[in-house]
């Protein structure tokens, strides 16, 4: 079972330790230090976070490889199950417009991202108006969120159903 605490030592390690896993703009793999994370649409401040992007063909710290690979595989299976449920409950006239059945869209895909987010403690030195994660809309086929390591701190805004 994946626990963020397994990754916490990586994120709280000195910057020099993390640099060898530095985020690569072309591959989207690796550690994105503070100041690199994106700015949410409609916001002019970067999110106050670090993250590590992991893909099945990517790399991560050796000590974290087994649990990260396992978590990636488990989340992939959850996503596949969710997509099958969505497919099964989608009206036929909409299903006919899909290029593939939804679960097949993620089979053998090299584009499935597992992002491990880290939100450092607030120091009081942050730019006014900066947030850990500003309101945003994910642009993925599906986003699977795990429970946060701090109970009750993950906020998800529900939008009206279509």
Protein language model annotation of sequence segments:
Residues 1-162:
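Peripheral, non-catalytic segments flanking oxidoreductase cores
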């Amino acid at each position: 079972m994946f626990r963020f605490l397994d990754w916490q030592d990586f994120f709280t390690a000195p910057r020099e330790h993390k640099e060898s896993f530095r985020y690569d703009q072309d591959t989207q793999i690796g550690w994105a230090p503070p100041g690199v994370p994106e700015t949410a649409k409609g916001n002019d401040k970067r999110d106050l976070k670090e993250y590590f992007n992991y893909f099945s063909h990517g790399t991560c710290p050796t000590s974290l490889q087994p649990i990260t690979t396992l978590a990636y595989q488990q989340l992939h299976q959850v996503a596949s199950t969710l997509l099958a449920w969505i497919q099964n409950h989608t009206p036929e006239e909409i299903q006919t417009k899909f290029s593939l059945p939804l679960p097949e869209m993620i089979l053998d895909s090299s584009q499935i991202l597992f992002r491990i987010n880290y939100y450092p403690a607030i120091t009081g030195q942050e730019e006014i108006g900066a947030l850990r994660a500003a309101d945003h809309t994910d642009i993925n086929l599906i986003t699977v969120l795990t429970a946060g390591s701090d109970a009750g701190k993950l906020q998800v805004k529900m939008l009206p159903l279509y």
